[in-house]
Design a protein with these regions (language model features):
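Charge-rich, low-complexity N-terminal segments
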Residues: 1-41, 85-88, 138, 149
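Short, well-structured hydrophobic secondary-structure segments
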Residues: 35-38, 42-58
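Ampiphathic alpha-helical segments that act as solvent-exposed interaction surfaces
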Residues: 73-82, 101-131
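A short beta-strand-loop-alpha-helix capping motif that often carries His-Thr
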Residues: 34, 87-99, 136-142
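Charged, low-complexity, helix/coiled-coil-prone segments
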Residues: 9-23, 50-68
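Short, highly charged C-terminal tails/helix-capping segments
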Residues: 127-149
Length: 149
């Protein structure tokens, strides 16, 4: 691992500690930092390029085979997306945003995490229903108190 990547990984860990209010964050087996946003499984990843970058990505829906109808739907979603990229890869609908380490701070990382997680959560159930897939996590049902109605 390059010195630049080690520095960036340390910086990302510190930002995630601040975001999640914990004293230590733990990377998964791939070296990414997982989190959940509704029905979406999300990760923060430090990319080991010549110039390291940070990618925030999510699985919105899984088990969805590629089709012309799916790609047309994803194109429509992508055209409305402001700060996230939506694409299909290996039977999964992915949402991601890549960040430069220059100027990376708590605010910019939080924006990326909320944008990616929010889009993935917003589109996951719809796409899973339309294309016979599933979301990484089940939808959280809100219990309705019948006496309150």
């Amino acid at each position: 691992m390059s010195t630049k990547k080690r520095w960036l990984r340390s910086h990302v860990e510190r930002l995630l500690q601040e975001e999640w209010g914990v004293c230590r964050v733990v990377a998964d087996a791939d070296g990414d930092y997982p989190y959940r946003s509704g029905t979406a499984a999300c990760w923060v990843q430090v990319l080991d390029f010549e110039r390291p970058m940070v990618r925030v990505f999510a699985h919105a829906a899984v088990g969805i085979p590629r089709s012309a109808k799916l790609l047309a739907e994803l194109n429509d979603i992508q055209n409305r997306a402001m700060t996230a990229t939506v694409r299909w890869y290996d039977d999964a609908v992915l949402v991601h945003q890549t960040l430069s380490p220059h100027g990376l701070n708590h605010k910019s990382l939080r924006q990326a995490m909320q944008a990616v997680g929010g889009v993935a959560d917003d589109i996951g159930l719809l796409l899973a229903g339309m294309f016979s897939g599933s979301t990484p996590f089940p939808a959280e049902s809100s219990a309705v108190d019948e006496e309150a109605c």
